[in-house]
Amino acid sequence: MPAALLLAGYLAIACAGESALHQAVEKGERKLVEQLLTSGADITVRTESGETVLHYAAFPKDAWFATRLIAAGADPCALNNAGESPLFWSALEGNVAVARTLLRQRADANARDAKGNLALHAAAHNGEAAMVRLLLPQTKEPNARNREGLTPRDYAAASGHTAVVKLLEGAHQ
């Protein structure tokens, strides 16, 4: 029944402006995502805080969602109201598979959010070592300071992520 209602458009927009497509992607519902896209779901719809469905592809640990959404026309460089890209969200979630997909589609690892943070700041803060390893070669300024004057290494150190600190120390040279 939920799929039929979603496809019929009865639940097109839910709380916080999430579309049925946002919800299906977030929950990792491949079949429903495919049905919604095939039925003409709006790939450009945003939540009240500006997230596209591609931002939500950071949640399921499956790059299929990002690949499929980009093939349907989703913008890998789209920013939400806080200036965060889908790559930034993938870094926060530690979703390396999605981040790799986004980078292949020209997502910008050097884009900064409204606070001046790179995706590398987000990955370092959360101790996502695999993500840091992926982002380091893509980041022009791995020691970039955000508006508070903090580097990704500062975030990793403050959060007690020693393995990430060691990775980032090599970037100081």
Regions found by a protein language model. Name each.
Residues 2-12:
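Bacterial N-terminal signal peptides
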Residues 15-52, 56:
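N-terminal segments that cap or nucleate solenoid repeat domains
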Residues 23-28, 56-62, 89-95, 122-128, ...:
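Ankyrin repeat A-helix N-terminal signature
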Residues 31-32, 64-65, 97-98, 130-131, ...:
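Conserved ankyrin/ankyrin-like repeat signature
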Residues 34-42, 67-75, 100-108, 133-141, ...:
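Ankyrin repeat domain, specifically the short helix-to-loop turn at the C-terminus of the second helix
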Residues 142-173:
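Leucine-rich solenoid repeat scaffolds
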